[in-house]
């Protein structure tokens, strides 16, 4: 007999917003300002429709039909893109921006990778259903039918393609299909009850997501590797103070881009988690960082291979 997992088993580390730590993490995500702005607005509308209603009263009092169209969008946002593109870090921290923007407290429920299950019959369906049960239970207590929500809940499912593969896939197990159906039902439950909650899905494999899941997305934000301008901003902002001149930074920008037509450039995480620490460690503890040593480091480093998105 299957036992419903506890709240702590499903969500090992719930995060409350606003808070300084996620605010700082969000600020460190340079080069993604457009995605930050877009996602915070979308989630703000989903978890606190009162905000846009007040905006409409002030600026467009006769635009009820247009506003209703915006508010009827399903409470799901998909963040899709290559590995190391910043989508998971953004999903884990954007709640802080939304909480400050809407002036409400928000709790993030990140679905633990350890809860994917061991393949027992009915387990995936049970896990997905339980995740939505806890999300809906918490959001229902925060609902306010007469004004601004008293708070909100964000359910984050990382590596979402593991939960929501296309039911059209001939190799898909019956149990997986049932898990997808449970996910779709969960999205519909939040929408139908008009709860202050939204679901964030992160995936490397957008094409693998079930069409019904994609149709329920209020927005699909795509993430790619940083272009020249983004890499320049990232490298310049992170390396300021190390004595590297503009010519050296430009050379680092070039070397972290595609080195031939068939090769990808560096990801955001390649630069922030591998390259910059390696530049510092190459000099530490007896030497200052030099242009020569920095260029040596980047020349020896290869970017993370591109993820091939297949159905």
From Swiss-Prot:
Keywords carried by this UniProt record: Antiviral defense, ATP-binding, Nucleotide-binding
UniProt binding sites for ATP: 84-89, 215-216
Signal peptide range: none
Nucleotide-binding among keywords: yes
Positions of disulphide bridges: none
Recorded family membership: Belongs to the AAA ATPase family.
Job of this protein: Regulates complex assembly in a CBASS antivirus system. CBASS (cyclic oligonucleotide-based antiphage signaling system) provides immunity against bacteriophage. The CD-NTase protein synthesizes cyclic nucleotides in response to infection; these serve as specific second messenger signals. The signals activate a diverse range of effectors, leading to bacterial cell death and thus abortive phage infection. A type III-C(AAA) CBASS system.
Oligomeric form and interacting partners: Homohexamer. Forms a 1:1:6 CdnC:Cap7:Cap6 complex.
Domain notes: In the disassembly complex (PDB:6P8V) Cap6 (this protein) crystallizes as a right-handed spiral; the top 4 subunits bind ATP while the bottom 2 do not. A CdnC monomer lies along the surface of the hexamer at the interface of subunits 5 and 6, with Cap7 (also called HORMA) at its tip, over the central hexamer pore. The N-terminus of Cap7 extends into the pore, contacting 5/6 Cap6 subunits.
The name this protein goes by in its record: CD-NTase-associated protein 6
Gene: cap6
């Amino acid at each position: 007999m299957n036992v419903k997992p506890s709240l702590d088993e499903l969500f090992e580390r719930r995060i409350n917003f606003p808070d300084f730590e996620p605010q700082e993490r969000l600020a460190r995500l340079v080069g993604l300002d457009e995605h930050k702005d877009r996602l915070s607005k979308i989630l703000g509308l989903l978890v606190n429709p009162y905000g846009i209603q007040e905006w409409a009263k002030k600026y467009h009092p006769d635009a009820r039909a247009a506003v209703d169209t915006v508010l009827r969008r399903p409470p799901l946002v998909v963040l899709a893109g290559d590995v190391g593109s910043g989508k998971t870090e953004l999903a884990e921290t954007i709640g802080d921006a939304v909480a400050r923007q809407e002036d409400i407290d928000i709790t993030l429920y990140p679905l633990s990778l350890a809860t994917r299950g061991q393949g027992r019959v009915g387990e995936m369906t049970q896990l997905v259903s339980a995740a939505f049960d806890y999300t809906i239970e918490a959001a229902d207590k925060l609902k306010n039918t007469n004004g601004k929500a008293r708070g909100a809940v964000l359910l984050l499912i990382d590596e979402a393609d593991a939960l929501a593969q296309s039911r059209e896939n001939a190799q898909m197990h019956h149990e997986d299909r049932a898990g997808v159906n449970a996910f779709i039902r969960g999205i519909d439950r939040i929408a139908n009850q008009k709860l202050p909650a939204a679901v964030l899905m992160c995936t490397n494999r957008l094409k693998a997501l079930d069409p019904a899941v994609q149709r329920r997305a209020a927005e699909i934000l795509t993430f790619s590797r940083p272009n020249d301008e983004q890499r320049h901003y990232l490298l310049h902002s992170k390396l300021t103070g190390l004595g590297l001149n503009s010519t050296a930074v430009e050379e680092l920008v070039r070397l972290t881009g595609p080195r031939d037509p068939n090769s990808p450039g560096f990801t955001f995480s390649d630069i922030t988690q591998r390259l910059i620490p390696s530049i510092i460690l190459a000099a530490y503890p007896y030497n200052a960082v030099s242009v020569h040593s920095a260029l040596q480091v980047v020349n020896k480093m290869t970017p993370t291979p591109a993820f091939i998105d297949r159905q």
